[in-house]
């Protein structure tokens, strides 16, 4: 069945919630760092963040403000309840809580038995609207932990694969959907999933969520199908304050990295960049429909009332999210023959006109139809924008980068594990020749291949060792083996050593010196100088300067670079590029 869709633009709605003081903070003399400065006729509000110690203050415009005295049910009545009727008309909606650890995100989404949060309130409303109708309600509940997805409703932890279907829509392979008929039945199922979610004690929170949790409610009727996603994001953490070690430090690094990827996506959408980095993390991949996609999205920014620096970081990202526009589409199950296009036939006709029928015949026996249709449908939607573009096509055009890529990248590396049939070399040789005439290569994406994207799941959770390129290996060799002549006095101190030992010692000293110089540079350089480094962009440079305001030397070892969202592999890659630049 094809779908008929009516599309409209809808910006992401951003509201701010300031949690009340905790019992442990009741005796604190600190005044809240955030307050409502004023409201505007169009519905906007202006909030002010003020640091009582430094007298710094910032002002931001948002869609709504809920202070410490506001209850969660007020947020639901004013913000969330408005998106629920649209689900019964075939649209999707997403509500997600964002903020630092300990800012009240999980309480906002889950609530308590006496004061239910947004999740139980939403389920109760959906079930009430389904009463006396033929609607069926199903739920799923899963978490993103250490860049892997796990089903929380299964007795045994089962990893979920994040895939794209032939139309480019996100699919979660292996995710269980459980029918729900009453609120009591929901609470019984949901409570089991909550107990399975990863939580742990940290220096800032006794029960800190160590994963992003997603509850999806799917409504199906004879005519339409809609979905509501309710997401409780894990909070970004400052490991200097949490004193995390071991596995907690690894979890924190993954959480910070995924939230940094989220800020990159929002920044790219605001700047209308041709390529949106959704695939930088599993979190941004799952939120792709909610940010710049085809879902109605509500972002609830949660704040700790006494943490100024955390509040600035949270609200600045939230304010930028307001400028992100989604493309809402209401899909109904109606046959629309005019929108059906046999893209395989169009490709064959074009190849025949160019005298390349032999290549397409070889592809027919080896590639699935989905592998061809996905990129071609994107191209066709771009070329026929005057009349045949659906809501999905317009969303793809906003994303930009995808519809400019070569069908099959001849320079791409295709791992052997993605192919499990004979004749794979013929596929690679053949597909190097097949390039659509109206498409141009995308220089930013040199490691991906359309063929790989069509045949395999996303690779954000691949083994980092497998993702290392030959260039990176060469960088490591340069870093360890080449040495300036001026450092020969270091080698002279190695007494009784063979020439090889001296050579290895020379490389080791050079490496340690480079690392220390790099850390010293991060501790003193200004914003413009930081941005000249490989791997340091504007946002990361700003965050480094923020860290230096709290501590004069925030970077004492390579592990401290995890505080700015860098993984160990990214740190290694940056040092490799730095070393390469020295020898050029």
UniProtKB/Swiss-Prot annotation:
TM stretches of this protein: none
Alphabetical keyword list: ATP-binding, Microtubule, Motor protein, Nucleotide-binding
GO-annotated biological processes: microtubule-based movement
Record InterPro entries: Kinesin-like_fam (IPR027640), Kinesin_motor_CS (IPR019821), Kinesin_motor_dom (IPR001752), Kinesin_motor_dom_sf (IPR036961), P-loop_NTPase (IPR027417), RuvA_2-like (IPR010994)
Gene Ontology MF annotations: ATP binding; ATP hydrolysis activity; microtubule binding; microtubule motor activity
PANTHER family xrefs: CHROMOSOME-ASSOCIATED KINESIN KIF4A-RELATED, KINESIN-LIKE PROTEIN
Stated family: Belongs to the TRAFAC class myosin-kinesin ATPase superfamily. Kinesin family. KIN-10 subfamily.
Protein name: Kinesin-like protein KIN-10C
Species this protein is from: Oryza sativa subsp. japonica (Rice)
């Amino acid at each position: 069945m094809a779908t008929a869709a009516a599309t409209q633009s809808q910006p992401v709605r951003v509201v701010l919630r300031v949690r009340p003081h905790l019992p442990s903070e009741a005796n604190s003399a600190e005044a809240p760092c955030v307050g409502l400065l004023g409201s505007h006729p169009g519905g906007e509000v202006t909030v002010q963040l003020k640091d009582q110690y430094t007298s710094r203050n910032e002002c931001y415009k948002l869609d709504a403000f809920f202070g410490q005295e506001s209850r969660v049910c007020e947020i639901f009545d004013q913000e969330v309840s408005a998106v629920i009727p649209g689900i019964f008309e075939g649209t999707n909606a997403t509500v997600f809580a964002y903020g630092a650890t300990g800012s009240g995100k999980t309480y906002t989404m889950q609530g308590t038995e006496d004061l239910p949060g947004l999740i139980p309130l939403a389920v109760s409303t959906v079930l009430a609207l389904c009463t006396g109708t033929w609607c069926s309600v199903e739920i799923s509940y899963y978490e993103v932990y250490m860049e892997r997805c796990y089903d929380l409703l299964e007795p045994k932890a089962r990893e979920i694969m994040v895939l794209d279907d032939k139309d480019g829509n996100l699919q979660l392979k292996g995710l269980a959907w459980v029918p729900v008929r009453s609120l009591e039945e929901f609470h019984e199922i949901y409570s089991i999933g909550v107990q399975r979610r990863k939580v742990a004690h940290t220096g800032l929170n006794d029960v800190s969520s160590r994963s992003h949790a997603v509850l999806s409610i799917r409504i199906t009727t004879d005519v339409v199908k809609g979905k509501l996603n309710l997401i409780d994001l894990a909070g970004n953490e400052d490991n200097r304050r949490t004193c995390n070690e071991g596995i907690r430090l690894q979890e924190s690094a993954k959480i910070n990295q995924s939230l940094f990827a989220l800020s990159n996506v929002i920044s790219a959408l605001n700047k209308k960049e041709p390529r949106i980095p959704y695939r930088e993390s599993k979190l941004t991949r799952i939120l792709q429909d909610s940010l710049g996609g085809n879902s109605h999205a509500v972002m609830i920014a949660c704040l700790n009332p006494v943490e100024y620096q955390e509040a600035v970081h949270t609200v600045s990202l939230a304010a930028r999210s307001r400028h992100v526009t989604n493309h809402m589409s209401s899909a109904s199950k109606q046959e629309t023959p005019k929108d059906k296009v046999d893209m395989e036939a169009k490709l064959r006709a074009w190849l025949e006109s160019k005298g390349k029928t032999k290549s397409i015949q070889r592809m027919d026996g080896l590639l699935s139809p989905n592998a061809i249709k996905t990129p071609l449908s994107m191209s066709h939607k771009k070329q026929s924008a005057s009349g045949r573009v659906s809501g999905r096509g317009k969303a793809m055009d906003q994303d930009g980068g995808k519809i400019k890529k070569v069908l099959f990248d001849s320079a791409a590396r295709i791992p052997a594990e993605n192919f499990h049939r004979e004749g794979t070399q013929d596929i690679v040789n053949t597909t190097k020749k097949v390039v659509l005439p109206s498409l141009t290569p995308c220089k930013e994406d040199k490691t991906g291949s359309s063929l790989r994207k069509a045949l395999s799941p996303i690779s954000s959770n691949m083994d980092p060792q497998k993702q290392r390129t030959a260039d990176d290996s060469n960088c490591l060799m340069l870093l360890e083996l080449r040495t300036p002549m001026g450092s020969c006095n270091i080698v002279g101190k190695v007494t009784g050593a063979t020439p090889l030992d001296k050579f290895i010692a020379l490389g080791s000293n050079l490496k340690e010196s480079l690392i220390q110089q790099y850390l010293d540079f991060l501790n003193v350089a200004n914003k413009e100088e930081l941005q000249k480094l490989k791997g340091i962009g504007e946002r990361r440079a700003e965050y480094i300067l923020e860290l230096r305001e709290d501590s004069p030397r925030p970077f004492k070892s390579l592990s401290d670079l995890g505080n700015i969202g860098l993984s160990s592999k990214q740190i290694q890659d940056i040092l490799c590029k730095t070393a390469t630049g020295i020898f050029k």
